[in-house]
Amino acid sequence: MPVAVMAQNPVSFQRLQEQCEEQELEAPGGIANPQVYSQLLALYLLHNDMNNARYLWKRIPPAIKSAHSELGGIWEVGQKIWQRDFPGIYTSISACQWSEAIQPVMEAVRDATRRRAFGLVSQAYTSISADDFAAFVGLSVEEAVKGVIEQGWQADLATRMVMPKKPDSAPLSLIPNEQQLARLTDYVAFLEN
């Protein structure tokens, strides 16, 4: 059974996940090879699909888990994501020597986690210390401050504080009254029939 091809962009990662899921389902005896499990687990983490990641971890036979330490490393990252331990996520990702098939996925997990952290900070904080922010996004203080400035945020080097820019709220799509009335009419007609 061939292992799924490498993926480099989000569409490819989604397709790779679908291929791995299919390979797991079609595996002889219901047990896929370890690389399929590794890729699928890492891809679930990338897409922040923690429920499927947990159930996959429970499905993987113990013999495969113990024989392939990389699976344990991926699951350790998953546990840190589950606990929302952002510094721990980055530490766990950099602590392992990933195989060639898993390396790009784990780098994407790190980048996606960093983007989520930036988004969370921008929504939750009016100011945060540069040290705390750097730990939260898994960068050195200098790199974090540089990233903040690139995002259009403010950084005060004297007080070592970062002031996030609030995200632009998505504009509400206003539906014209005629469309609302037509939609309501269709709904009522459906309920009557």
UniProtKB/Swiss-Prot annotation:
- Which key words are in the record? Cytoplasm, Nucleus, Signalosome
Which Gene Ontology terms of cellular component type are present? COP9 signalosome; cytoplasm
Q: What is its main location?
A: cytoplasm
Which GO BP terms, alphabetically?
COP9 signalosome assembly; protein deneddylation
Please give the Pfam families that the UniProt record associates with this protein: CSN8_PSD8_EIF3K
**Gene3D superfamilies, per database record:** 1.25.40.990
Domain PCI positions: 8-181
Q: Where in the cell is it found?
A: Cytoplasm; Nucleus
InterPro entries (UniProt xref): COP9_CSN8, CSN8_PSD8_EIF3K, PCI_dom
Q: Which family does it belong to?
A: Belongs to the CSN8 family.
Q: How does it assemble?
A: Component of the CSN complex, probably composed of cops1, cops2, cops3, cops4, cops5, cops6, cops7, cops8 and cops9.
What the protein does comes down to: Component of the COP9 signalosome complex (CSN), a complex involved in various cellular and developmental processes. The CSN complex is an essential regulator of the ubiquitin (Ubl) conjugation pathway by mediating the deneddylation of the cullin subunits of E3 ligase complexes, leading to modify the Ubl ligase activity.
Q: What is this protein called?
A: COP9 signalosome complex subunit 8
Q: What is the protein's species of origin?
A: Xenopus tropicalis (Western clawed frog)
UniProt lists the gene as csn8
